[in-house]
Amino acid sequence: VPKMGLVFGEPGLGKTNAILWWAIQQDALIITAKNGMTPRWILKQLVSDLGEAPKILVTDLFEQAVAKLVENPRMIIVDEIDYLINNTRAIKTIRDLHDETGIPILLVGMGAVDKKLSRYKHFFDRIVEIYRFIPFDFEDVKTIINTLSDIPFEDAAIEVVYQKSNRFRQIVKIILKFENLAKTNEYKIITKHIAESELL
């Protein structure tokens, strides 16, 4: 049974933080794809992350990775899969690892990666779950602020933050800015007026 998933969305929506959290929960291996990454590079990193000394030849590396993953199955997360889209051999290596070991593989990418991956029919057919990260709504922003901020925000101030940004990375920066501002000015709460004066 295929066990591949795809998570994608625009930058700044919290994909990386979500997969790092998920990787810790699942004891998963993370491979962060890079421009020009080859099958050998992928396998060498994977084998190293599995605690083995990588062999030289790609075929030996592949067998080494498969043996280790069969012995101790661990989910693999491939972040920045976009970098591998035009590398058929790299895509096939990931597919073959999945097929040989049966381990779950989660692919993480940007905006239209689902459409780009769909051109690899035999690969894309193995993806059983697809989740798209979308910008946050007001309630999401409120939850993030209330969870992460050391200083409370009025709902009207949260609305100002929401209008300014609904992407995770930017919201975290705004929270840090207001925490520092509150500490410096001894604010007990972030009001709409404070939020507007700093963000608008």
Segments from the language model and where they lie:
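P-loop NTPase Walker A phosphate-binding motif
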Residues: 5-28
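Phosphate-binding P-loop
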Residues: 1-2, 69
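Conserved alpha-helical scaffold flanking the Walker A/P-loop in AAA+ ATPase domains
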Residues: 55-73
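Conserved P-loop NTPase "ATPase switch" module shared by AAA+ and STAND
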Residues: 68-90, 109
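Substrate-engagement module of ASCE P-loop NTPases
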Residues: 95-105, 110
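Short regulatory helix/loop adjacent to the ATP-binding pocket of P-loop NTPases
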Residues: 113-128
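Conserved NTP-binding/hydrolysis module of P-loop NTPases
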Residues: 27-30, 39-56
